[in-house]
Design a protein with these regions (language model features):
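Bacterial N-terminal signal peptides
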Residues: 6-16
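N-terminal "domain-start" segment that seeds a small globular fold
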Residues: 20-44
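Conserved beta-strand segments of alpha/beta enzyme cores
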Residues: 82, 106-107
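Positively charged n-region of N-terminal signal peptides that target proteins for export
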Residues: 1-5
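Structural microenvironment flanking redox-active thiols in thiol-disulfide oxidoreductases
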Residues: 64-101, 113-116
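Structural beta-sheet core signal
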Residues: 54, 83-85, 130
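Thiol/disulfide oxidoreductase modules built on the thioredoxin-like
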Residues: 100-103, 113-155
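Short active-site neighborhood of thiol/selenol oxidoreductases, capturing the structured segment around
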Residues: 43-64
Length: 160
């Protein structure tokens, strides 16, 4: 009985500790290289001071809920922030549903075999990473927690 209780406790600990692990991003450090297989309709977002990459799946209700808010922030800070919606889905499956999100500041990228998800250590979606022009991470977390106040703080931060 003690052995069973020990095993159940160990499994419960592993499950909770795994879900609490941080992603593979260290603020102030370079973000990993993105392995983009292709861009939806070959459209990449215009250059901006900051890039927000959202790790996304078109069937995820959480992703669908967060995307309009992030797009609104991108539009509010015109020219300061662009958005890359990154998915591991096939072009044929996700392309149709994601086409509506394309704009000068928003692009949809298809990950090459999940390599970018792996490089970033993504353990949940929608996960966001914001990095500057030089590729240094300035913010990361759940897409739901990214808002205008957060981006205002990013804009006031001066890199030395």
């Amino acid at each position: 009985m003690k052995l069973l209780l020990t095993i159940v406790s160990a499994i419960a600990f592993m499950l909770t500790s795994t879900s609490a692990e941080a992603q593979n991003i260290i603020l102030g450090e370079k973000v990993p290289d993105s392995r983009i297989r292709s861009w939806l309709m070959d459209l990449q977002p215009d250059a901006a001071d900051y890039t927000c990459i959202i790790f996304y799946h078109s069937k995820s209700p959480r992703c669908q809920e967060c995307l309009p808010k992030i797009k609104r922030i991108v539009n509010t800070y015109e020219g300061k922030l662009n958005l890359i919606i990154l998915t591991k889905e096939d072009y044929s499956k996700a392309g149709v549903t994601l086409t509506e999100h394309l704009s000068d500041r928003v692009g949809v990228a298809f990950d090459d075999g999940g390599r970018t998800f792996i490089a970033y250590g993504v353990r949940f979606i929608p996960f966001c990473v914001i990095y500057d022009k030089k590729g240094y991470a300035v913010w990361c977390g759940h897409a739901k927690s990214f808002d205008e106040k957060t981006f205002d703080r990013i804009l006031t931060y001066k890199r030395k």
